[in-house]
Amino acid sequence: PRKTTAPKPTAPAGPATATVTLPTANEQFDYQIGSAYTLPKNVRVVSRDRTAKPAAGLYNICYVNAFQTQPDALDWWEKNQPDLLLRDGSGAPVQDEDWGEVLLDTSTAGKRERLAQIVGGWIDGCAKSGFQAVEPDNLDSYERSDGLLTKQHNAAFARLLAQRSHAAGLAIGQKNTTALLPERKTIGFDFAVAEECGQYEECEEYAAAYENRVYVIEYTDTGYGRACAGWGGKLSVVQRDLDVSAPGGSYRYRAC
């Protein structure tokens, strides 16, 4: 990526009380959701956790785990909102075992409204901290729900988050989940954050849907090579280590 034109304000989809600024396509990107650190040279767009500070002078995307619990937050949910955790027939929380996270229950309108109050508070916090956009993670949690959640449950919740984001003056990114690309406008998504679209040959779908406003993270050499060869001139493509760690140890970052 070499473009340096400033992001242009655009009218958001759905209700809004503030101007939303979209990220510029094909600017150099870094994915710092594991730990914030000094930015590599030429980076203009960065994604950081909602608890981190945004980078001065850059376009900052705020990472929010909106559809699952953070591993260290499960006790809070169990104590304060136990019925918002998705549970199986025996009453046990349904887990994303790869990451040690419990799925949030988006299956009813009432629960979605309550979840939107909680996650919406985080989104408002992103705006107050100075971020320009939000990426709600685990939009695809329904795929790990053993049939207890559907694509439409999560789309309906994402719509509430898009409305809250736009009202706070934040753009909102679709995180993965090509199955929901046809509903992107109904939901209100503005751009995409796509993990491993090179690895799984999905970059073209995101690029077409979002006019190249796609921020690609690859974790393998193969995926990075494919994404760069096919899309490095149009999309923002980086390779990170799976733990998205700070420099040192397993840290890896490169961009094309």
Please report, for each region that a protein language model flagged, where it lies by residue.
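Glycan-processing catalytic domains of CAZymes
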Residues: 9-256
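Secretory targeting and sorting signals
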Residues: 1-4, 10
